Amino acid sequence: MKQKAFCLLLFLFICESLFEQRILEKEIYRLPTTWELFVNALIFVESRGDENAVGSKNDVGVLQITPIYVEEVNRILGKNIYNLEDRYSKEKSLEMFEIVQMYHNPQKNVDKAIKLHNPRAGKQYAVKIKRQMDYLRTK
């Protein structure tokens, strides 16, 4: 009887371990969402991932955020949470980007997101981002 109970417990332990391993494997090999591809493509197009990148119009960081963009984020939040130095932080730049997008583009439409992020950019800007998304999708 003890041997059967031991075998049953061992079997359950092995099953649980395999189940946990499958969950971890799925998490590791999960394909990125369209939005994640878009954000990564945008970062590449804007700065090639350089947190210290400086553009020609006082735009800086991985997402080339302008002072007006920081003002808009703080306006949305109703208080001054972010400052101009935060543009140099990838993490804070992404937070600001998500705040603007969630406020103006809650459905996460990529075309609208591109226009919101850089309203003065032409069609070629959107084409560059979408090409980069396609490239990232194949990696």
Predicted regions and their residues:
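Export/targeting segments at the very N-terminus of extracytoplasmic proteins
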Residues: 2-7, 11-51, 76-77, 90-102, ...
